[in-house]
UniProtKB/Swiss-Prot annotation:
Modified residues (N6-acetyllysine): 103
Organism: Mus musculus (Mouse)
Pathway linked to the protein: Purine metabolism; IMP biosynthesis via salvage pathway; IMP from hypoxanthine: step 1/1
Assigned EC number: 2.4.2.8
Compartments, record wording: Cytoplasm
PROSITE patterns for the chain: PUR_PYR_PR_TRANSFER
Protein name (Swiss-Prot/TrEMBL): Hypoxanthine-guanine phosphoribosyltransferase
Length: 218
């Protein structure tokens, strides 16, 4: 039986990197505490995840389902690596994409009230290998809701790839099949992860400062 792939574990006392060591947009200079995961490390890890995905799912038509909005950069980069592997494989397979949007956050807390936006026509998932691509797993409740929805369409296989998984006491115990980084319970932004729609334009994953939280609070 396939096992979940290992992840890069970032410890609770990880100091991160000084903002001055990286190119950070000036409009966010006072809003961030530190760079937590540099963009280059994200890309290297994503390349390896693509290999793991193809090894486990590459025998049948894959439908890659992007969870918007936070997942779009990870989704695009992961698919670029998967497509490169697929092009150079002797047993290449067709791959299609679809999109769904979930809403469960206000400010820095998951509300528990999960809204599914889109996904009205997911009948194309029937009989396919479905790869759900998410930016971050916090409590796991949001993903459990989405998995319940997807499984109603009888896919051949469903796997989840998430760039980040938080270690938090609020977790329901859900763990994705493919994980980039396991991180402490900090609110992170950047690489399309947002705080009330801000910070998506950062290349790196960063820890937001209290100043930033207050400035962009809903």
């Amino acid at each position: 039986m396939p096992t979940r792939s290992p992840s890069v574990v970032i410890s609770d006392d990880e100091p991160g990197y000084d903002l001055d060591l990286f190119c950070i947009p000036n409009h966010y200079a006072e809003d961030l505490e530190k760079v937590f995961i540099p963009h280059g490390l994200i890309m290297d890890r994503t390349e390896r995840l693509a290999r793991d995905v193809m090894k486990e799912m590459g025998g049948h038509h894959i439908v890659a389902l992007c969870v918007l909005k936070g997942g779009y950069k990870f989704f695009a980069d992961l698919l670029d690596y998967i497509k490169a592997l697929n092009r150079n494989s002797d047993r290449s397979i067709p791959m299609t994409v679809d999109f769904i949007r979930l809403k469960s956050y206000c400010n820095d807390q998951s509300t528990g009230d999960i809204k599914v936006i889109g996904g009205d026509d997911l009948s194309t998932l029937t009989g396919k290998n479905v790869l759900i691509v998410e930016d971050i797993i916090d409590t796991g409740k949001t993903m459990q809701t989405l998995l319940s929805l997807v499984k109603q369409y009888s896919p051949k296989m469903v796997k989840v790839a998430s760039l980040l998984v938080k270690r938090t006491s609020r977790s329901v115990g859900y763990r994705p099949d493919f994980v980039g980084f396991e991180i402490p319970d900090k609110f992170v932004v950047g690489y399309a992860l947002d705080y009330n729609e801000y910070f998506r334009d950062l290349n790196h994953v960063c820890v937001i400062s209290e100043t930033g939280k207050a400035k962009y609070k809903a």
